[in-house]
């Protein structure tokens, strides 16, 4: 069963609300400040391709395990290359991307450490691994936890992280 199937079409509608527009503008400002110049971007857990449409890389690749999200992403971001795959086993050669983006992805994977190791494996030397998570004590995580407790997918499967150690390197650039 695809836990994202019921919301794939409406996934981005939230960004059009006043609060959603504010949050996404802040996220975009933060992201653009972290992203180095380069040719290639891989987004793991790309969803509907929101970031793939907005980030300035000539080669953009989205990895998404949800067939429903993948279908919407291919329609909304046809300029990107889309691959149905899981973050724990990325189907790319080592050192293939200048930037790897994991944005609200680690909450939904089975093996966080494996995903981070895979991201590091496909990252070129000097590249940037950018990770965005819903912090465990945040109001957003509390809301999604409540939805999950009520059985609302995909939040019923989400895990919220108190901290992230990037595949053996505890250094985080903020």
Q: What does each model-found stretch correspond to?
A:
Residues 1-47, 50-54, 69, 128-157:
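Conserved class I S-adenosyl-L-methionine
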Residues 47-89:
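Class I SAM-dependent methyltransferase SAM/SAH-binding core
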Residues 101:
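A conserved beta-strand element that flanks and buttresses the S-adenosyl-L-methionine
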Residues 113-125:
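A short glycine-rich, Lys/Arg-flanked "PGG" loop and its adjoining helix->strand segment in the class I
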Residues 156-171:
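Short alpha-helix
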């Amino acid at each position: 069963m695809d836990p994202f199937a019921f919301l794939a079409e409406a996934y981005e509608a939230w960004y059009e609300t006043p609060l959603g527009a504010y949050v996404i503008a802040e996220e975009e400002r933060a992201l653009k400040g972290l992203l180095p110049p380069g040719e290639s971007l891989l987004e793991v857990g790309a969803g509907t391709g929101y970031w793939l449409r907005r980030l300035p890389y000539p080669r953009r690749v989205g990895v998404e395990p949800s067939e429903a999200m993948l279908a919407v992403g291919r329609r909304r971001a046809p300029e990107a290359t889309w691959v149905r795959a899981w973050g724990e086993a990325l189907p790319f050669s080592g050192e293939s991307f200048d930037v790897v983006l994991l944005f609200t992805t680690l909450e939904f994977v089975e093996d966080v450490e494996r995903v981070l190791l895979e991201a590091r494996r496909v990252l070129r030397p000097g590249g940037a691994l950018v990770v965005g998570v819903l912090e465990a004590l945040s109001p957003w995580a509390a809301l999604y936890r409540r939805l999950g407790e009520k059985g609302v997918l995909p939040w019923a499967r989400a895990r919220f992280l108190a901290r992230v150690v990037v595949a053996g390197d505890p250094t985080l650039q903020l």
